[in-house]
């Protein structure tokens, strides 16, 4: 689901730096002991020493002391509470790291403080994506609050961050959630409309996103298919003609239009080429169907799409 962030390599580098500075820190025995215990994964003992350090007049003015305190909480969160959106250790880690940024000597430790904040930001982002798949009804407040926390910390850790791709991933994840709910009960048009709204919001953010156009096309195409499925032997002839006209009109005026936009942006993407061919087939556009079948064969021969997928 979505595009999860994984910064384990970066965090590993930060840990080495953390240990080195802990050994080098002068006049801060409590902080150094906390760092050493954290390195040994003795987190309860490390936290006790770190708590003593931030309440020590001699050590609490130093950014490194607050960094170590935040780092210990971060490690406990990572090892014991990862995925817990209400984690007090994550919140405490954040508060201590932000406190470290306000100390007079924060500049000396700024890089490693920001790396720790960047890691915490990534967990908020991943939680936002996960929560978007299990929201109750149409209440998006939880994933959007988590995303806001991600943005807030990233603006501190990496001020030049471009959030466009992250915003699109959240909208996509919400769209997938609503689409899945609609597929479970196609009579509930609310889910279809919400899915459409989310993918349309991606287009508003980035008019070059081929996946968003593709998903909008799929929604309307499936809607037309579900309309066709209502036809049966007992359907009145006039009603059948009306329903067929509405379904084909939906494919022609909405689904195909968005699929053509997707194709213009990504003409060699397998699902898009196959999707546009299927829509032309539904509309009895024989020449277009023949053209796209040839395109699919070319893309298969060039190794750009898999041959085991249906043409």
Model segments located where?
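Start-of-domain marker
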Residues: 26-91, 98, 108
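Flexible helix-coil transition and linker loops at the boundaries of alpha-helical arrays
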Residues: 53-64, 99-117, 151-169, 184-185, ...
């Amino acid at each position: 689901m979505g595009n999860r962030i994984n910064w384990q390599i970066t965090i590993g580098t930060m840990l080495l730096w953390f240990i080195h500075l802990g050994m080098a820190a002068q006049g801060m025995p409590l902080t150094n002991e906390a760092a050493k215990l954290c390195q040994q994964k003795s987190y309860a003992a490390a936290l006790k020493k770190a708590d003593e350090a931030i309440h020590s007049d001699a050590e609490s003015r130093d950014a490194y002391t607050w960094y170590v305190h935040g780092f210990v909480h971060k490690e406990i969160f990572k090892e014991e509470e990862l995925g817990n959106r209400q984690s007090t250790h994550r919140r405490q880690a954040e508060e201590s790291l932000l406190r470290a940024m306000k100390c007079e000597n924060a500049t000396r430790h700024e890089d490693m403080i920001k790396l720790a904040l960047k890691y915490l930001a990534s967990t908020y982002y991943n939680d936002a994506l996960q929560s978007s798949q299990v929201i109750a009804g149409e209440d998006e407040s939880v994933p959007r609050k988590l995303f806001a926390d991600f943005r807030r910390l990233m603006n501190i850790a990496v001020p030049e961050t471009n959030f466009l791709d992250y915003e699109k991933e959240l909208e996509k994840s919400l769209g997938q959630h609503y689409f899945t709910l609609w597929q479970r009960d196609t009579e509930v048009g609310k889910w279809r409309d919400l899915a459409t709204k989310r993918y349309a919001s991606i287009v508003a953010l980035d008019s070059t996103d081929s996946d968003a156009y593709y998903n909008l096309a799929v929604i309307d195409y499936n809607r037309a298919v579900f309309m066709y499925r209502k036809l049966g032997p007992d359907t009145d002839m006039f009603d059948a003609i009306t329903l067929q006209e509405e379904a084909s009109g939906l494919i022609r005026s909405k689904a195909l239009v968005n699929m053509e936009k997707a194709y213009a942006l990504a003409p060699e993407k397998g699902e898009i080429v196959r999707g546009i061919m299927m829509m032309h087939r539904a509309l009895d556009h024989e020449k277009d169907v023949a053209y796209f079948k040839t395109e699919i064969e070319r893309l298969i021969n060039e190794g750009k799409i898999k041959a085991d997928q249906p043409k």
